[in-house]
Amino acid sequence: MRGTVSVPKKAEDAKADPPAKKKADTQASSHTLLEGRLGYQLESALLVRALTHRSYAYENGGLPTNERLEFLGDSVLGLVVTDTLYRTHPDLPEGQLAKLRAAVVNSRALAEVGRGLELGSFIRLGRGEEGTGGRDKASILADTLEAVIGAVYLDQGLDAASELVHRLFDPLIEKSSNLGAGLDWKTSLQELTATEGLGVPEYLVTETGPDHEKTFTAAARVGGVSYGTGTGRSKKEAEQQAAESAWRSIRAAADERAKATADAVDADPDEASASA
């Protein structure tokens, strides 16, 4: 009679430990890290979908992408930010509220929040996007962040999604109120330089690095004078940073002049009245 040798179940498991299991363990650990940063534990399949870019889906047999969740998250984000601005600025007209919202809900701002979460390292990307620096592309980071917000809404409800949006975006909401035009730094700078009679800003941009990993440096100049510089992974990002730097520099100088004038009036009001 031929005997059979039975292999203990645990030994079988150890012997047949596939790379897929190791990959699943790594993914679970990665998701735990992201969930810790978000402050919420989500249903696993939902989080996976939120992190699945269409390039990965197409290269892997047409898996579900994060685009529907992105659509949902965009609406949740817009609602929470709009509600906050409406309550925070009771005297602002609709047009100005819309500009403030646009300063918060845009690809550049969302990408910066995504970078703060190191979201790029968790995204499932196709090989093509991976090879062209997709993990740091503003559009991909912004879309994925909206998808994650959508996933939190579906899994945890509106209160949880609202809390997450406030935690991630309240600093930007506060910052948006300090923008001159309330839309973006380039618009703000142009309005400020017009008010101060300085002329129209121009941007000188240089680039360094290989094609797939370029770094852009921009200088914001007004009337031939450089007021600020900025760097970024895109020309637009570098120009925005340069515009912000220039805006703050020109605004500070204008505030100093206004303060000096006010001090002079306080010191000798009669002379100030005569001059007027």
From Swiss-Prot:
Q: Which residues form the RNase III domain?
A: 31-157
Q: Name one GO molecular function term.
A: double-stranded RNA binding
Stretches of Basic and acidic residues bias are at 9-25
Cell compartments where the protein resides: Cytoplasm
NCBIfam families xref list: RNaseIII (TIGR02191)
HAMAP family per record:
RNase_III (MF_00104)
The protein depicted here goes by the name Ribonuclease 3
Species assigned in the record: Streptomyces coelicolor (strain ATCC BAA-471 / A3(2) / M145)
